[in-house]
Design a protein with these regions (language model features):
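Conserved Helicase C-terminal RecA-like lobe
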Residues: 44-60, 84-216, 287-327
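Inter-lobe coupling linker of SF2 helicases/translocases
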Residues: 7-110, 141-144, 256, 265, ...
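Signature of the SF2 helicase/ATPase Hel1-core->accessory helical subdomain module
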Residues: 1-24, 229-235, 243-246
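Phosphate- and divalent-cation-binding pockets in alpha/beta enzyme and binding domains
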Residues: 4-7, 63, 157-161, 213-216, ...
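A conserved SF2-helicase RecA2
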Residues: 231-240, 244-326
Length: 327
């Protein structure tokens, strides 16, 4: 799944080197030469998307404001006309903020904050509101007899959640888990098999960069929770397909929850991903590629910040530099 029509230009140019193709013409040029069967045509049940927004604690919000100010300072040099879209630098700044929102303890790895007393006090409070919610929700679903797939872009989150849910038989997969024989439960294949066959294994925690392709979980799991997401639309759509694919029974009700902190970078990521999915749906003439949100009250990471596009950068800069500069 490309992130934008621009990603299809090189593919089209390779197939038709004599054709003049640009970002704006590639969609019209590709329409007559591709065939794609949509999920709607296959009769796959519609996926239900829900957003759950949780508030930061007062202390986390205070540190978040400090972090935003620091990011604004770091981004100032890239706002000049000559270097406005130094995407990698912007991506690194954004990833630090996303890490903190998903799990405040990740900020303790940053030497600028390692000895901040506020960070220490925050870590004594909890694992953070998002992880607290995800673990609580996973327990609710497990109590209903459901298996749950939990996604996070950060390896430390993947392992931490699996540890917190070890009483539910939680397994985890990220880039550090080796491939191997499915009879060995320490391998990627072994963990997947256990999730499929062991009734005591109620939870699988995974990283989209390492586990978004080549795995079918829809036969045993129709519920996924995203602790966080990156700007990488390809990883997101592929990870979603682990539980939403051909073979689902017609009466299945697959559901996805996106967990966000209120008034945070999470909303910027969601808006950008929704736009990318909508753009690709129009390009591929596939209305099933949609993320209709209903609100609910209440070095793999390097690959993610390298996936930041110029439009993502614009959205990030607008978020950090618009509105109240004291926020």
């Amino acid at each position: 799944m490309p992130q934008s029509p621009k990603d299809m230009v090189s593919q089209f140019s390779f197939l038709y080197p004599t054709k003049d193709v640009t970002d704006t013409t590639v969609i019209d040029l590709i329409q007559p030469i591709f065939v794609r069967t949509t999920k709607g045509q296959l009769g796959i049940p519609k996926l239900d998307h829900r957003v759950v927004q949780v508030p930061m604690t007062q202390l986390q919000r205070e540190i978040y404001k400090t972090l935003k100010s620091e990011v604004r300072r770091q981004l100032n040099p890239v706002l000049s006309d000559s270097s406005r879209y130094e995407l990698r630098r912007i991506g690194k700044c954004v990833m630090k903020v996303m890490e903190f929102v998903s799990n405040p303890s990740l900020l303790s790895n940053d030497m600028d904050y390692a000895f901040d007393r506020r960070v220490g006090a925050l870590l004594l409070e909890s694992d953070g509101p998002k992880i607290d919610y995800v673990c609580r929700r996973a327990r609710q679903l497990a109590a209903e007899g459901k298996k749950v797939l939990i996604w996070s872009s950060f390896v430390q989150n993947v392992e931490l959640i699996a540890l917190r849910l070890s009483d539910l038989g939680a397994e985890f997969i990220h880039g550090g888990v080796d491939a191997g024989d499915e009879s060995d439960f320490d391998t990627r294949e072994g963990k997947i098999k256990r999730f499929h066959t062991d009734d005591t294994c109620k939870v699988l925690v995974a990283n989209p960069a390492a586990c978004s392709e080549g795995i079918s979980l829809h036969k045993v799991c129709q519920y996924a929770i995203y602790l966080d997401r990156s700007f990488n639309a390809a990883h997101y759509m592929q990870s979603e397909d682990r539980i939403h694919r051909l073979g689902l029974s017609p009466d299945a009700k697959p559901q996805i929850e996106f967990v966000e902190c209120e008034d945070s970078i999470d909303q910027v990521v969601r808006t950008r991903l929704e736009l990318k999915v909508k753009t690709m749906a129009q390009a591929l003439e596939d209305s099933s590629l949609s993320v209709e949100i209903s609100s609910v009250d209440y070095d793999e990471e390097a690959e993610d910040y390298d996936s930041l596009t110029a439009d993502d950068a614009k959205a990030v800069i607008e978020y950090f530099f618009s509105g109240d500069q004291n926020d």
